[in-house]
Regions:
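A short, acidic, amphipathic alpha-helical segment used as a generic capping/interface helix at domain edges
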Residues: 231-244
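Active-site acidic/histidine proton-transfer and metal-coordination neighborhood
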Residues: 25, 41, 60, 72-162, ...
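Conserved beta-strand positions in the central sheet of alpha/beta enzyme cores
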Residues: 36, 63, 96, 133, ...
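N-terminal pre-domain/capping segments
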Residues: 1-93, 130, 161, 272-283
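C-terminal/domain-terminus segments
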Residues: 250-278
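Acidic-and-aromatic substrate-binding clefts and catalytic sites of carbohydrate-active enzymes
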Residues: 12-18, 34-47, 67-78, 102-106, ...
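Acidic/histidine-rich catalytic cores of soluble enzymes
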Residues: 6, 123-229, 233
Length: 283
């Protein structure tokens, strides 16, 4: 059975203030035991605190994050050995790429070249006992020549598995449950965040009154929000059950924007909903 955990990107500010160990202690007190690390500097000091949390608190490091270009995570091209060493230090068996560089995503040729590089990296990581994964957003559901970018990634880099983010699947115009079914056996990691429709802002009314149709459409489309699990429109029992059926190992709560709420309060809301649905045994 998979473990429900937390994507630590949403706690990066707290880590910057209090350090990884204290944040991980608060997470375990809040009823979580697994994490995925992203956008947190993997300095020797931070890795040492994470390892301490593993040893003393029993934290399970489900996955670490990396990139193949500039960004907040270590680059697999330039720091391969360090990333492998971090995985060994934390007993992490999965490394995930949050997104390919936008310069690669811009063209079919760029996607193919990205896949060529990541396929080589996936093979090298596999030799070290680590599995590489690609995390989707909505843009990977763009169709080129009748094929989505995500399917092209699978075809061109078969050694790289998938991390399915159900919010971004929905935003990409696909059904999360059917997408998890489609990629069953290829998905070890799933991101849990809701797809919430917020209120129209005052800018929409102002644009309508002024006759600025372009501004109105921008405001009209900007109501999609990143919700706590259970606070939006996704069917969570179906999503979690299909994640289990598809072979996922970690289901990771994430929220890209908190809209002024405290991160731990957001996590508590998501956790409570999953417990109410009967998934406490996965925590």
């Amino acid at each position: 059975m998979p473990t429900i955990g937390v994507q630590m990107m949403m706690l990066r500010d707290e880590v910057g203030k209090a350090g990884p160990y204290e944040v991980l202690r608060r997470l375990t007190d809040a009823g979580f035991r697994a994490v995925e690390v992203s956008q947190i500097p993997m300095t020797p000091e931070n890795v040492a605190e994470m390892r301490r949390a593993r040893d003393e608190l029993g934290v399970d490091f489900g996955a670490l994050s990396a990139a193949v270009g500039p960004g907040p995570n270590d680059c697999l091209v330039e720091r391969f050995d360090k990333i492998v060493a971090d995985c060994r230090a934390l007993d992490a068996r999965h490394v995930r790429i949050g997104m390919m560089p936008l310069s690669a995503l811009a063209t079919t040729e760029g996607v193919v070249e990205f896949c060529r590089r990541t396929q080589d990296i996936a093979t090298r990581l596999a030799d070290e006992g680590v599995q590489l994964h690609y995390h989707n957003h909505h843009v990977e559901f763009a169709r080129r020549g009748g094929v989505t970018v995500l399917d092209a990634i699978r075809a061109e880099a078969p050694g790289m598995r998938l991390e399915i983010d159900v919010h971004w699947v929905q935003r990409g115009g696909r059904d999360p449950v059917r997408t998890l079914q489609k990629y069953a056996g290829l998905v070890d990691l799933v991101h849990l965040k809701d797809y919430r429709i917020g209120e129209l802002g005052p800018g929409a009314l102002e644009a309508q009154r002024s006759g600025d149709r372009e501004a109105f459409l921008r405001e009209f489309a900007a109501v999609v929000e990143f919700g706590e699990v259970g606070e939006g429109n996704l069917e969570w029992a179906e999503i979690v059950d299909q994640s289990i059926a598809s072979g996922a190992e970690y289901l990771l709560i994430e929220q890209d924007v908190l809209y002024g709420r405290d991160a731990f309060d957001c996590l508590a809301t998501s956790r409570e909903h999953l417990v109410d649905l009967g998934y406490e045994k996965l925590l």
